[in-house]
Curated annotation (Swiss-Prot):
It catalyses: a phosphate monoester + H2O = an alcohol + phosphate. Its EC number is 3.1.3.1. Zn(2+) 1 binds at residues 60, 110, 375-376. Glycans are attached at residues 140, 267, 277. The gene is Alpg. Residues 503-529 form a propeptide. It comes from Mus musculus (Mouse). This is Alkaline phosphatase, germ cell type. Keywords: Calcium, Cell membrane, Disulfide bond, Glycoprotein, GPI-anchor, Hydrolase, Lipoprotein, Magnesium, Membrane, Metal-binding, Signal, Zinc. Residues 1-18 form the signal peptide. Mg(2+) binds at residues 60, 173, 329. Zn(2+) 2 binds at residues 334, 338, 450.
Length: 529
């Protein structure tokens, strides 16, 4: 029992000895680990060539506390104690902190932050792809204030480009790669005021297919691409999932007509088939009417995981000998936090790290720069002096001043603020372990808010050593542009990667065989009576 192995006196804590691995009781264990890390650090040398390929993976709302909690959860899922586990992003040798504020807000949103790290310019809250001279919801402040994304510059340089997300592809973060809008909510013309349409502003879905030639588009957001009332392919009887467009345009058909080798898919099976067909040069996969399902609710036979979408994108984009730019978003980490349902947020973050692992293993650090970061953090914390190895979703080992139990994970505000008979609920282990449990919050809000602390940047590959110290968030875009010698750094003076080989690493064939095996199993299952 906790009373037998936990002594809480002020800030002192004694952990039950049975929890501590025996080898960790010996100072030599820690000295050896530190010496190994020191040796690796001394051997670390910057890769001073240019980057043929650029990959940025962004965990929406993945603040440092979320990264740490994800590390613990991943370890516990693997049967370990948790904190000692290494995430894929932890393997990257270079890192920095990013200051996330918007030009007008101390606590930022995904539109302003996305514009910063994707375009290289900070801007106002709720504004995408425009400078801070633009004003939210004022259409006439759009023109002349556009800023250009690194992805757009990569395309101009002849590289292939792609966008992958677990949200809708019109969401503020992916939209930062291609759109210019004074309102992040203008997914289709149905969300826009008549005055904005009359003034010539375009909805984000229209900009997705018209602003630039994107080779791979994978995520959710189907209903914003089709005329109002068009039945959804997956949910034909659910009118809430039907098309929303008032202009009668079928943007998917318009996009297909632009490219001879274009393919549109809406489920995992079609995605795998299309990705293996080398005649497919452009791929759009929209797997849900709006955001994709949480990982814990995903039907693996119907919808691809973020890791699978990342693999498909890398494989297709790698066909271009001039290289590629890829943006990957683990977007529903943010949504889980807004709901104060930590189980959803952290399981999404574990899947996001799997996508990082895919990108890392499918590419070479000699020619591919990979950056992993977040747009902002959340008022998410975990504490309470829990025992090492205790569930990240579990209770603190002592009672609060009101005599009731509390979870290690708590939120500063949000819908988790609930009173029962005028008092805080006494939560149980069974309740806190439920995947739908809302952690308690200090202040009642319908949706938990972002927070303002710095977020981490992890980097590997050519010029990754430039990711260092504490930087403004827009620095990220400039590092990536410089590494690939893109505008405005075309005279970067960097040598090309040795050999200019394909980005896909030797381990790629094994993952391809796994995809093929999965497809065969699906076909066999479908053939059974």
């Amino acid at each position: 029992m906790w009373g037998a192995c936990l002594l809480l006196l002020g800030l002192s804590l004694q952990v039950c000895p049975s929890v501590i691995p025996v080898e960790e009781e010996n100072p030599a264990f820690w000295n050896r680990k530190a010496a190994e890390a020191l040796d690796a650090a001394k051997k670390l040398k910057p890769i001073q060539t240019s980057a043929k390929n650029l990959v940025i993976l962004m965990g929406d709302g993945m603040g440092v506390s979320t990264v740490t909690a994800t590390r613990i959860l991943k370890g516990q899922q693997q049967g370990h104690l948790g904190p000692e586990t290494q995430l894929a992003m932890d393997r990257f040798p270079h890192m920095a902190l990013s200051k996330t504020y918007n030009t007008d807000k101390q606590i930022p949103d995904s539109a302003g932050t996305g514009t910063a790290f994707l375009c290289g310019v900070k801007t106002n809250m709720k504004v995408i792809g425009l400078s801070a001279a633009a004003r939210f919801n004022q259409c006439n402040t759009t023109w002349g204030n556009e800023v250009v994304s690194v992805m757009h510059r990569a395309k101009k340089a002849g590289k292939s480009v792609g966008v992958v997300t677990t949200t809708s592809v019109q969401h503020a973060s992916p939209a930062g790669t291609y759109a210019h809008t004074v309102n992040r909510g203008w997914y289709s013309d149905a969300q826009m005021p008549a005055s904005a349409l009359q003034d010539g502003c375009k909805d984000i879905s229209t900009q997705l297919i018209s602003n630039m030639d994107i080779d791979v588009i994978l995520g959710g957001g189907r209903k914003f691409m089709f005329p109002k009332g068009t039945p959804d392919q997956e949910y034909p009887t659910d009118t809430k999932q039907a098309g929303t467009r008032l202009d009668g345009r079928n943007l998917v058909q318009e996009w297909l007509a632009k490219h001879q080798g274009a393919r549109y898919v809406w489920n995992r099976s079609e995605l795998i088939q299309a990705s293996l067909n080398r005649s497919v040069t452009h791929l759009m996969g929209l797997f849900e009417p709006n955001d994709m399902k949480y990982e814990i609710h995903r039907d693996p036979a119907q919808d691809p995981s973020l890791a699978e979408m990342t693999e498909v994108a890398v494989r297709m984009l790698s066909r271009n000998p001039k290289g590629f730019y890829l943006f990957v978003e683990g977007g529903r980490i943010d949504h889980g936090h807004h709901e104060t349902v930590a189980y959803r947020a952290l399981t999404e973050a574990v899947m996001f790290d799997s996508a990082v692992d895919k990108a890392d293993k499918l590419t070479s650090e000699q020619d591919t720069m990979i950056l992993v970061t977040a747009d902002h953090s959340h008022v998410f914390s975990f504490g309470g002096y829990t025992q090492r190895g205790a569930s990240i979703f579990g209770l603190a080992p002592f009672k609060a001043e009101d005599g009731k139990s509390f979870t290690s994970i708590l939120y500063g505000n949000g819908p988790g603020y609930k009173l029962h008979n005028g008092a805080r609920a006494d939560v149980t282990e069974e309740e806190s372990s439920n995947p739908t449990y809302q952690q308690q919050a200090a202040v009642p809000l319908s949706s938990e808010t972002h927070s303002g602390e710095d977020v981490a940047i992890f980097a590997r590959g050519p010029q990754a050593h430039l990711v260092h110290g504490v930087q403004e968030q827009n620095y990220i875009a400039h590092v990536m542009a410089f590494a690939a010698c893109l505008e405005p750094y075309t005279d970067c003076g960097l040598a090309s990667p040795a050999g200019q080989s394909s980005a896909v690493s030797p381990g790629y064939m094994s993952t391809l065989l796994c995809l093929l095996a999965g497809k065969m199993l699906m076909l066999m299952a479908a053939a059974e009576p």
